[in-house]
Design a protein with these regions (language model features):
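Short, well-ordered alpha-helical microsegments
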Residues: 12-15, 93, 123, 146-147
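Class I SAM-dependent methyltransferase SAM-binding "motif I" and its flanking Rossmann-like core
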Residues: 61-134
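Short secondary-structure boundary/capping segments
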Residues: 16-17, 48, 104-106, 128-130, ...
Length: 168
């Protein structure tokens, strides 16, 4: 039903085939460590697009409510009295771990989950949570910083034999 779809890099492009034939597609994907569209520009695009289109879909991949700038975009639409509806999907942390048979929590093993980002870790120290054998760490955007991240975890008391899964 959408007149326009504003979509990100992480969205499966096959989803766009479900749109009506005259739908307008606007790509606003961000690529790590490359020049990309700034969030302020995306926010303005949300406002500008609604002037010419009655039904807009903001299609985001990953988990928008976890390091995905959901708050910034909601402030723009709600602050401009634009009606919206959020239709959540499966979180990337929950979906990817379940698909790979990795429980985030497990009786007697992991009683807590911490979500954090390692995106800035290449340039600065990121404070990691205190070591706990009963905690699962879900570290988003950590591929580039993986060697530094592992070293920091070991330096903070995690065993070098701690099980990790890298999902990209």
């Amino acid at each position: 039903e959408a007149d326009a779809v504003i979509y990100d890099r992480l969205v499966n492009p096959l989803l766009l085939f479900y749109c009506k034939p005259d739908c307008v597609f606007i790509y606003v994907g961000k690529t790590p460590y490359q020049s990309s569209m700034q969030q302020e520009t995306i926010n303005q695009l949300l406002l500008d697009t609604q002037k010419n289109h009655s039904k807009i879909v903001r299609l985001k991949g990953g988990t928008p409510e976890i390091f995905g700038r959901l708050t910034e975009e909601l402030e723009v639409v709600s602050g401009n009295n634009i009606a919206f509806e959020i239709i959540p999907g499966v979180s990337s942390a929950g979906g990817s771990t379940a698909y790979n048979g990795i429980p985030l929590t497990e009786r007697g093993q992991a009683r807590a989950v911490t979500f954090m980002t390692a995106h800035l870790m290449m340039n600065e120290e990121v404070l990691l949570p205190e070591h706990s054998a009963e905690q699962t760490l879900c570290i988003y955007m950590g591929i580039e910083a993986l060697p530094k991240l592992i070293l920091q975890l070991v330096n903070q008391g995690f065993s070098a034999n701690t099980k990790i899964a890298v999902i990209s």
